[in-house]
Amino acid sequence: MVLRERLSHILFHEKVGFLLLCLLWYISSAVTNTTSKSIFNELRCPVTLTFLQFGFVAFFSAVCLLFRKQFLGGTGIQKPSKYVLYTTLPLSIFQIGGHVFGSLATTKIPVSTVHTVKALSPLFTVLAYRFMFRHVYSAMTYFSLVPLTFGVTLACSFELSADIVGLLYALISTCIFVSQNIFGSKIFMEAKSHSTHTKKHYNKLNLLLYSSGVAFIVMIPVWLYQEGFAYLPEVGSPVFLNLIYNGLSHFFQNILAFTLLSIISPVAYSIASLIKRIFVIVVSIIWFQQATNFTQGSGIFLTAIGLWLYDRSKKGNLYESCKVKEFEKDALELEEQTMEDEKSYPSSGTQSPFYGKNFLPQITPRLDSVVPLISDSPMTPNSVYSNEGVTSSVSGNATPASVRQSTQNDFSNSNIHDRRSSYTFQLNNFKAPQPSRLWATETVPTLKI
C-alpha cells in the first residue's frame, strides 16, 4: 500500500511524473499521425481509418474496464444515462466530421502541413466568439494572432502550389473542431440544466467508451456508403499491422489526454497541447525526411511564437474572468438576500407597485442615483417622494379598479424609515404626489448600487 501511494505521488504530483505523462502523450500522438500517413501511402482509405479508430478506442476502453473489474476490483462498464447520451451524440457528429476531413487532408499533404494549418484554431475561435457572440478580447490576444497567421502562411506557402485541396480539407477540419469546442460547451451546460442532478459519475474509460462507441455506431452507414468492406486490409499485411498500431496509439493518446486534463489546469493543458503540436510537426518532418526550406522553417517558428503568445493572453483573460465570476456570485447573493428582505417586510395589506423591483422599502433612495439607471421610466424628480397631497397622472397598470393609500403628514426624523410614498390607482392611471421642492431627499441616505 505504501509503495502504491508512493508511485501515485511520483506519477501525478511531482514534475517527473508530469513530464513522463506529457512525453508519452507526445509519442503516442506522433505515432498515430505517422502511421496514418504510412497507411495512406499504401491504401487511401480516410473514412475506413477514422471508422476503425473510433472502434479501436471503444474496444480497448471496454477491455480495460472489464480487466479492471475482474482483477483489480475497480469500476467496470457503467450503464449510460440520458445525460451521457445527450452530450455524446451531438459531439460525435463533430468528431466524425473533423477526423474524416483531417484524414482526407493527410492523404494529400504532409502531416507537418496538416498540423501547421490546425494551429490556426485560435484565430477561428477568436473570430467566432467576436462576431457571433460579441465577445471582446484583450489587445494581447489580437496581437498574438499576427505572428500565428503569418507563420502558417509562410509554412504553407510551398503547399499552395502543390495541393490546394489538401489545405482546404485541413482548414475544414480545423473549423469543425473549433465549432465542437464552442457548441460543445453549450451542449454540456444545457444538459446539466436539464439533468436530474444524479450523483452518478463516470470515469475516464467509461467516457471514452461511450463517446467513441456512439461515434462508431453513427459512422457505420457513412463508412458503408463511402468505402465499405473493400477497403479493409488483409490480416497479417503491413497495412493491417499499421492499423493495429494506429488504433493502440490513438487509444493511448486519448486516455493520456484525459489524464493530463484531470490533473493540471486548462492553461497548463493548452501549453502542453501547443508543445505536442510542435513535437508532431518536427517528428513527422524527420520521420518522412521531408525537405524543408528556410521559409517553411521560419513559418513554423512564427507559428509556435504565435501559439505561445495566445496561451499567455488566455492566462490573463482567465484571471479577469475569475474576478468577474466572483463579482457576479457576490451580486447574485446580494440580490437573493434583498428579495428575502422584501418578502419578509410587514405589509399593510396592500401590495406596493415596487414589490419585486429590488428596492428596499425601509431605505428611501436619492433620485439622482436611481432615476438615471431606469430606462423608459415615468419617474422624475417632480413626481415622487413628497409630503404634499397634490398628484400628477402617470401611466401604469393596475388590477384593482380603485385602491387608495393615505400618506402621513408627520415627516420627522424619528419615523423616517416608516414613510410611504402616496399613490393612487385609478383605472390604469398611477398618480404620484408632487414634492414641495425640487429635491426632497437631501437628508436620506444614498442607495449604493
Swiss-Prot record:
GO cellular component, one term: endoplasmic reticulum
Keywords annotated in UniProt: Membrane, Phosphoprotein, Transmembrane, Transmembrane helix, Transport
Domain of life, source organism: Eukaryota
Modified residues (Phosphotyrosine): 355
A Gene Ontology BP annotation from the UniProt entry: triose phosphate transmembrane transport
Phosphoserine modified-residue sites: 348, 352
Pfam families for this protein: TPT
Polar residues biased stretches: 382-415
Record membrane topology: Multi-pass membrane protein
GO MF terms held by the record: antiporter activity; phosphoenolpyruvate transmembrane transporter activity; triose-phosphate transmembrane transporter activity
Name under which the protein is recorded: Putative transporter C83.11
PANTHER family registered for this protein in UniProt: SOLUTE CARRIER FAMILY 35
Location(s) in or outside the cell: Membrane
